């Protein structure tokens, strides 16, 4: 039967009802030309009414309210599904473990925890999926295939939904605004994760060491340390990195590139954070305050290192010697020192080390290379560890440091 529904030109609530009825009518849409496009994510629709309903995703509008619990929804159908929860309790039960859920979607999400519901396994990273097409989509991450290209900046993505999320970056509309700092966001997830910074909440927790993170991406990067993944390797010295950002920073050591210039004194830096740290030398700004004492610091890192002096809780203990550590990573590195073997040997002097990282840090001693420079006084060091020890001297009064290419004593 032909649909003869006509748009209402008079009352707003009738138009609302009609749009929701049209939302469920998919038959005509599959045949009709999708001529109306969303200005935010470029998704196309065959009717303007469908586009207006879709816009609620970006505006956050939720006109349908549950009169039992006050929860609001963008669509009438979503409210109907929600009302079933109040009426039925937990009607959906898992056949494997007997746990019950309020919605079918929650049950389906839970079922993926049982191994037999994830038969499609990735042979490269051991991840499992309940559907073959999900595995195929995941495999693009390993093959490097990125068929979905942004027409604005040329950036490519392995999956269409990642492209859609990226397109929001080019949109000037940012419907989600932080009421504490005024920063705007195109995606609600980005807004929610940003709010974790203000609240101090860290909902993404590592299941191996218990460390929490405000961002999901931060947890994903952290997990590479546990898996000992270092996919980014320098082709000049062989050093590997778990994060691309760290790799890019390292490469500037070989190229000598210093793109960040101070507009006060003309000094140039390899890294943006080094310039930012240097600028506090001109301004004298120390915005990071310790809430346990009256000390102030120019960077969050200096404050973080200082706070550790107040924290007496040592969590991880060495079973061999009893030494304690704040981080599990520190304990694991320490435990290697109880081994009788030092498999990494320097061919110039014969000195041996427990890890390849220690050997790589030692090698610049023979080449007179001093790639690690203090961004405050420009003293240079052959090893990162020496630089870190030196930078701690800037936490208090600035020492009388010499700059330039003069050699510094790091032993």
Swiss-Prot record:
Q: Which is a GO BP term held by this UniProt record?
A: gastrulation with mouth forming second
Disulphides: none
What organism is this sequence from? Danio rerio (Zebrafish)
Instruction: List the taxonomic lineage.
Output: Eukaryota, Metazoa, Chordata, Craniata, Vertebrata
Designated gene of the protein: drl
- Output the InterPro entries linked to this UniProt entry: Znf_C2H2-type (IPR050758), Znf_C2H2_sf (IPR036236), Znf_C2H2_type (IPR013087)
Q: Where are the C2H2-type-classified zinc fingers?
A: 36-58, 64-86, 92-114, 120-142, 148-170, 176-198, 204-226, 232-254, 260-282, 288-310, 316-338, 344-366, 372-394
Q: Which residues form a coiled coil?
A: none
* Gene3D superfamilies (alphabetical): Classic Zinc Finger
| The protein's name | Zinc finger protein draculin
Pfam families hit by this protein: zf-C2H2, zf-C2H2_6
Superkingdom of origin: Eukaryota
- Identify the SUPFAM superfamilies for this entry: beta-beta-alpha zinc fingers
Q: Where does this protein have compositionally biased stretches of type Basic and acidic residues?
A: 8-32
The region called Disordered is annotated at 1-33
Tissues expressed in: Specifically expressed in the hematopoietic lineage during embryogenesis; first expressed at the late blastula stage around the blastoderm margin. During gastrulation, restricted to the ventral mesoderm, the presumptive prechordal plate and the dorso-marginal cells of the organizer. At the 3-somite stage, strongly expressed in a caudal domain (marking the erythroid lineage) and a cephalic domain of the lateral mesoderm. At the 8- to 10-somite stage, caudal expression is in two bands of lateral mesoderm which later converge at the midline.
One Gene Ontology term of the molecular function aspect: RNA polymerase II transcription regulatory region sequence-specific DNA binding
Any one cellular-component term (Gene Ontology): nucleus
Provide the alphabetized UniProt keywords. Answer: Developmental protein, Metal-binding, Repeat, Zinc, Zinc-finger
């Amino acid at each position: 039967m032909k649909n003869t529904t006509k748009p209402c030109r008079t009352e707003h609530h009738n138009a609302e009802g009609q749009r929701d009825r049209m939302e469920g009518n998919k038959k005509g849409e599959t045949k009709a030309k999708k001529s109306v496009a969303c200005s935010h994510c470029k998704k196309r629709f065959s009717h303007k009414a469908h586009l207006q309903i879709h816009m609620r995703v970006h505006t956050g509008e939720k006109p349908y309210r549950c009169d039992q619990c006050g929860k609001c929804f963008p669509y009438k159908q979503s409210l109907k599904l929600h009302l079933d929860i109040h009426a039925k309790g937990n009607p959906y039960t898992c056949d494997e473990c007997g746990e019950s859920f309020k919605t079918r979607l929650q049950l389906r999400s839970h079922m993926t925890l049982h191994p037999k519901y994830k038969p499609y396994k990735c042979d490269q990273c051991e991840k499992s999926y309940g559907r073959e097409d999900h595995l195929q989509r995941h495999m693009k991450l390993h093959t490097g295939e990125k068929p979905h290209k942004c027409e604005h900046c040329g950036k490519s993505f392995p999956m269409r939904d990642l492209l859609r999320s990226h397109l929001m970056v080019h949109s000037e509309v940012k419907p989600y605004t932080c009421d504490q700092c005024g920063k705007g966001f195109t995606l609600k997830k980005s807004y929610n994760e940003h709010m974790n910074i203000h609240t101090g909440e860290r909902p993404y927790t590592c299941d191996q060491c218990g460390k929490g993170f405000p961002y999901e991406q931060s947890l994903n990067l952290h997990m590479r340390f546990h898996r000992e993944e270092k996919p980014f390797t320098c082709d000049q010295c062989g050093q590997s990195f778990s994060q691309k950002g760290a790799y890019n920073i390292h490469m500037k050591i070989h190229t000598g590139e210093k793109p960040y210039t101070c507009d006060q004194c003309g000094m140039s830096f390899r890294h943006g954070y080094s310039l930012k740290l240097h600028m506090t030398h001109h301004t004298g700004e120390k915005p990071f305050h310790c809430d346990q004492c009256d000390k102030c610091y120019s960077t969050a890192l200096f404050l973080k290192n200082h706070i550790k002096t107040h924290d007496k809780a040592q969590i991880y203990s060495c079973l061999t010697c009893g030494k304690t550590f704040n981080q599990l990573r520190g304990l694991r590195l320490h435990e290697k020192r109880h081994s009788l073997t030092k498999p990494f040997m320097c061919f110039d002097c014969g000195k041996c080390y427990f890890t390849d990282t220690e050997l790589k840090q030692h090698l610049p001693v023979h080449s007179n290379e001093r790639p690690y420079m203090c961004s405050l006084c420009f003293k240079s060091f052959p090893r990162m560890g020496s630089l870190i020890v030196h930078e701690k001297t800037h936490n208090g009064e600035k020492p009388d440091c010499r700059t330039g290419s003069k050699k510094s004593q790091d032993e």
